[in-house]
């Protein structure tokens, strides 16, 4: 945890930046790199009766770490995706509550 769900980026592109991205994110979140999951979603966009490329979008699901960490996290994701030649990228955060997140059937607020 955190989980990154990425669309509009090819898997082979994302794989190229995945290690340096996770290294930077781990430093921002002050946790190990093994805490991160990155999923590259294969989606198909449609608009005005046409098939179009999906817009580059990253959804981050995590436990809140504050404005500063969130800002740095979004900037790091943006920087690494833009390094692939993708000029436009959006990042959105979904925040989990520890009392509603379970690991191995146990609530995180009770671990």
Labelled PLM ranges:
Residues 1-111:
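Interaction-mediating elements
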